[in-house]
UniProtKB/Swiss-Prot annotation:
Listed HAMAP family: GcvPA
Source organism per UniProt: Desulfovibrio desulfuricans (strain ATCC 27774 / DSM 6949 / MB)
UniProt GO MF annotations: glycine dehydrogenase (decarboxylating) activity
A Pfam family this chain is assigned to: GDC-P
One Gene Ontology biological process: glycine decarboxylation via glycine cleavage system
Superkingdom of origin: Bacteria
InterPro entries per UniProt: GcvPA, GDC-P_N, PyrdxlP-dep_Trfase, PyrdxlP-dep_Trfase_major, PyrdxlP-dep_Trfase_small
Enzyme type, top EC level: oxidoreductase
SUPFAM superfamilies (UniProt xref): PLP-dependent transferases (SSF53383)
Name of the protein in question: Probable glycine dehydrogenase (decarboxylating) subunit 1
Amino acid sequence: MPYIPHTPEELQEMLSVVGVRDLDGLFADIPPEMRPKQFNLPKGQSEAAVCAYFEGLAAKNCPDLVSFLGAGYYAHDIPKAVDALAGRSEFYTSYTPYQPECSQGTLQAIFEFQTAISRLLGMDCANASVYDGGTAIFEAAMMAVRSTRRRVLVVDEAVNPIWRVMLASYISSLDLELKTVQQEKGVSRLDALMAAIDDTTAAVIVQNPNFFGAVADYTQVFAKARAHKAFGVISVYPVMQSVLKTPGEMGADVAVAEGQSIGMPLSFGGPYLGLMTCRKEHIRQFPGRIVGRTTDVDGKTGYVLTLQAREQHIRRAKATSNICSNQALCALRALIHLSLLGPCGLTRLAENNMALTRYAVERLTSIKGIELLNDAPYGNEVALRLPMPAQMLVDALSAHGCVPGYPLGRYYPGMEDVLLLACTERNSRQQIGMLAETVGGLL
């Protein structure tokens, strides 16, 4: 049976209101040669057939694999209270409320989220979230372009390649220049980044730890950017922020992150969470919702959407961004997750994962032919050079129920023999030992 709620009479009534005769008239502005002649879609199926099809797709997943995958998305333990609280009907929406008098609980939760993220990254202000880490980098770049009225973006090649592709796609029709500074053996070249900054630069964009897991201090890079009145933008890994120098301490203008690691399970395509923070002086160029705390006429504390003149529903085409609804439910999960861990718990988590990674490096580099790609400091993720193609190792071990890491040759030509390995609290020393023994046996 069809699940179309409108009768033919209702459809005709709607068409007459907009002034067209039929459905084709709605698309008259699109030239016929630009319209698809047919869609490569299967014929309609019964409910049972559709369920069977998707169950077959789901059965291809391998939830029992021992995984050392990272590359920007990480398998962390999530307290059960996160699901229990975020799943309450009062919160279960991605939409930001416009009517503060009806939604004080949701607004306060977003305000507390902003406070937590600002403190975690050491920055002045945070927004209510954007879609994901890649979107956050683009929005930060556009903040810089609007503020500086410049067209050149300097990007470190060691920034997550997925996010760099997203950035390039977003700006492809905006007459902006993307200037990529090459990494060297997985290490960001700070001197080259500083040399690339001049009076035409809108922003310099870096990542810490970078995609290869290498940790660096970008204070001098941001100082050079500020000297040329350009923005310093940095993407970070939230869990590692409890033990690393914060973006605020480095002097960043905008700090962003993929928030999946704090409260979101791994999922193909999301939903994930884009974190955005900035210095107070840039807040009027900030995209998305911002919740503020105020006092009403009776002296009671209240929470409201503030600085709305930046937004699409007010400024329309002149808004700072076309983002409307944000990832409010994912932001709530992140807030609950951080609150349950607390500052000490988050620090212990990062230290535990770093210790596991050091142990993995110790075991694997004791195997002949395996070595660190570089001698840079690392956190819970590290690049290893192998005596064989990394993809071959991944394929061989996956057949035995273990994914040893990510083959970097997929994104970086010439690094076909480099494996990116990450450890979280979901891994154990026993699993690392089994990984080392299996790899040693194959080599």
